[in-house]
Amino acid sequence: MRFTTTIWRPPSLENFKPKFRIYANGVAQVRIYCFGTVSSSRLYNAHNLFDKSPGRDRESYISLLFGFSRDGRTQEAKRLFLNIHRLGMEMDCSIFSSVLKVSATLCDELFGRQLHCQCIKFGFLDDVSVGTSLVDTYMKGSNFKDGRKVFDEMKERNVVTWTTLISGYARNSMNDEVLTLFMRMQNEGTQPNSFTFAAALGVLAEEGVGGRGLQVHTVVVKNGLDKTIPVSNSLINLYLKCGNVRKARILFDKTEVKSVVTWNSMISGYAANGLDLEALGMFYSMRLNYVRLSESSFASVIKLCANLKELRFTEQLHCSVVKYGFLFDQNIRTALMVAYSKCTAMLDALRLFKEIGCVGNVVSWTAMISGFLQNDGKEEAVDLFSEMKRKGVRPNEFTYSVILTALPVISPSEVHAQVVKTNYERSSTVGTALLDAYVKLGKVEEAAKVFSGIDDKDIVAWSAMLAGYAQTGETEAAIKMFGELTKGGIKPNEFTFSSILNVCAATNASMGQGKQFHGFAIKSRLDSSLCVSSALLTMYAKKGNIESAEEVFKRQREKDLVSWNSMISGYAQHGQAMKALDVFKEMKKRKVKMDGVTFIGVFAACTHAGLVEEGEKYFDIMVRDCKIAPTKEHNSCMVDLYSRAGQLEKAMKVIENMPNPAGSTIWRTILAACRVHKKTELGRLAAEKIIAMKPEDSAAYVLLSNMYAESGDWQERAKVRKLMNERNVKKEPGYSWIEVKNKTYSFLAGDRSHPLKDQIYMKLEDLSTRLKDLGYEPDTSYVLQDIDDEHKEAVLAQHSERLAIAFGLIATPKGSPLLIIKNLRVCGDCHLVIKLIAKIEEREIVVRDSNRFHHFSSDGVCSCGDFW
């Protein structure tokens, strides 16, 4: 039979040239040579030919190996290489270069090391292609040490070698190494290619270094590489991440060939810069231009829907995802669940979670737990967390950090025990969440222990711990920690400054230190940040410097609700009721959405100024116009408003109409008003209510005792004092503080412990003489002890605020203002005396008592208008 030299040729195998060699035994052996890029269909046909060939030579094996490698069929390429090795065929550099690329794609470190050994054995490491592929293998396996070692030992390197190493570092955010190598390769005479520039630009984008990015952009244009897709995409990404959206859009419009990555960069960049509508517009343009959407396209736009809470659009995208076959992509699946959760469609999120079989996926479980927490489903979140563990899904660090926000349904100590077993407590993410949970429960010591155990403390962990100290008023610990932070080379962010400024707003904190931190914030260019400026506003208002608070408020480029509320409350506490109401009117004019806190500040302003009708009007606005249901705090404010004005019947009517029984705070307000307005019977009722709820509350006993003393009922007063002794209730002593040269000094009534006590009492005697020259007569009714008037006058003269003022007058330059803080209410006699002292000494004196600020001007007038 005659042997034919023609065989059937598949129509799709255009780039393959089958050649035949006729052996003596008449068997044809096929060689398949691949030219150009082999498509998947052609490679499939080539593979079939290879399998059907009765005999195969080395060239056939190598050709198919190259085809598999180029087509990304890594497992088949690996098996074929092992066959070549097993058959003892001759190896060369091209084979190892090809199979090392396969190893890099597989991230198979063991296989890569075996290939490395073979390269050493055959002496192929001097080949630049093999060395480059080996570097790529190690870098993709995150083995940077060995990857760099291979690179450093290479005798010859080309631009691909440099780019491979640089790209490996860039993928793992090792930015310093990227930029160092980028400069070094040019110094050594290797010109970067488009992929090298893309990697360097990516790093500059991550660091937000727009200036250096512009320099690289100039070099790219000079080299004519700005039109290439990798560089073009990286430039667009750079400008977007640096906030230069306009420049990014210009580059995008000039890009002739736009890949799906180009479109995705614009969508995610717009979203990151808060331009949600522009991002949606870009997505629609992408579809109009018939660009095939990728998984990243869908993930980006679904996240956008989550931010905008667009349920309908989310549902449409869900349908498109199913159509494109992307539903089982983890990023898309998680993005859909998050979007449904943020749109409050928890049933849809839960249905998706169950339908697509997320049972073993920790990311999906975490997304669902987070969704429940965002929708006030703390119990459901904790139940899901428990179910997750029962089904054998191990929580990761993000799961633990999310579930720790489910306080008080879950105990941080319970989660802490689980975290210790996994060693996650040492991670910054979980450690910070854990210490934050302890802080919210007031367990600052536990939080500090967790903080000390975190290995790499980032700025978030430091800020959280500072916030804890701010919450508990541990000023010294917070300031010490801030010093440690800066000494450690960590750069404070806006939240760090916000926390430390909140610490400085505490009663026992130094105003001077607060000003120093303000200066530090200015130096760091963070003083204009919204959270920092709001903290500054609050600090200055609480420390008695309402003018500085007002200045900060005016300079704010943007104001959030916290800023508006802080300014209203600040004015209210300083007795500037009309300014507080003007701020409220400005809010209304700008259509700022108000909350319950806004009206608490407004009611406080009306209360301190005795504006009863105004307070009633704003209460109606809150309920009728703003649709805010009155809370316990709002009712307490209205009771205070009526009580201070002597309208106790209206105050009692508010209490009667409250949905829940009044608490001790409201009854204490009634009791204080009864003392001022001589309503003994109602005062007795209020005291009984308080003592029944809080038997240890000394304020109730003291107010009732004082009320009896003022009415001359010493017998009833004695009974109250006896009851206090029987129950071991101690009266809170009156303290006053003053800050001089960044140091705080405290005084008790009749205090003689200060080193300058002699000078202080001499100053008080001098002031007493000058006060009497002005016609001052002590009001001994404020001394609630059964002693003679002479002794009562001596007691009045030694009240703690007077001692603090006397010390301030001798310890500070003449004419400088004084700020006194007192833990109790200033008595009427001291109020009059301080007005006269301010006039005599020609000084401004600010006193912060338990109710409000009193600004005593040098002309002897108080900001409260003698109504407090």
Curated annotation (Swiss-Prot):
Keywords from the UniProt entry: Repeat
Chain spans, region Type E(+) motif: 742-772
Single GO MF descriptor: RNA binding
Entry keyword annotation includes Repeat: yes
Region described as Type E motif: 666-741
PPR repeat segments: 57-91, 92-126, 127-157, 158-192, 193-227, 228-258, 259-293, 294-328, 329-359, 361-395, 396-426, 427-457, 458-492, 493-528, 529-559, 560-594, 595-625, 631-661
Pfam families in the record: DYW_deaminase, E_motif, Eplus_motif, PPR, PPR_2
InterPro entries membership: DYW_dom, E_motif, Eplus_motif, Pentatricopeptide_rpt, PPR_At4g14850-like_plant, TPR-like_helical_dom_sf
Cysteine pairs bridged by disulfides in the record: none
Region (Type DYW motif): 773-868
GO BP field: RNA modification
Keyword hit for Repeat: yes
NCBIfam families per UniProt: PPR
Family as reported in the entry's similarity comment: Belongs to the PPR family. PCMP-H subfamily.
This protein's name: Pentatricopeptide repeat-containing protein At2g27610
Organism: Arabidopsis thaliana (Mouse-ear cress)
Organism ancestry: Eukaryota, Viridiplantae, Streptophyta, Embryophyta, Tracheophyta
